């Protein structure tokens, strides 16, 4: 049942399209017949219309040729030099800034004048005219000349330097070395004796040696030691 319905719809749309095509063909033929007809007396002819079109094209071309000159004149008018008016800044505190700018301009002019020599000498932004090498060296204080005393001149004898002379004057005649002296031939025993002597000295500071002053006391102590206890120590026990 679905297939015959689809066919009927297709036939309906096909017929509709055919009718539209026929209507378009009829309207086109009518317009062509009207165009082929002669225009009225008041209307301009085709030749006059063509000539008018040619004149319009020529005018457009001439207008285009004139436009570039006008554009150049306008551009020239736009690039006018601007002249800055001088203003009095004496009331304001801007003079220092203006002076610094003037100094920078002067330095740039000097660098431009020097040209290639500036780069060859290795300037690269530093002015060689101002530097520590151009500063005037301060006057050095005069160095006082040291006057040395003249040495005594010896007419005879052998020359000796001053150091040798001083050593000779301080020397003393030396005899043979002392073998048993601890100072010339030190040993470990000498150090031990030295420590003992130091101890003895310290003991002497704290104790006093007394000789032959307490003989009576010594004899009394001896007699007490010689006494014998002959009493019966156990007699007390017998009495009880």
Curated annotation (Swiss-Prot):
Alphabetic keyword roster: Acetylation, Cytoplasm
Bias (Low complexity): 27-52
One Pfam family in the UniProt entry: CDV3
UniProt biased composition (Polar residues): 127-141, 181-192
Composition bias, Basic and acidic residues: 1-15, 57-73, 193-204
Modified residues (N-acetylalanine): 2
Compartments where found: Cytoplasm
Gene Ontology CC: one annotated term: cytoplasm
Name of the protein described by the UniProt record: Protein CDV3 homolog A
Organism: Xenopus laevis (African clawed frog)
Organism lineage string: Eukaryota, Metazoa, Chordata, Craniata, Vertebrata
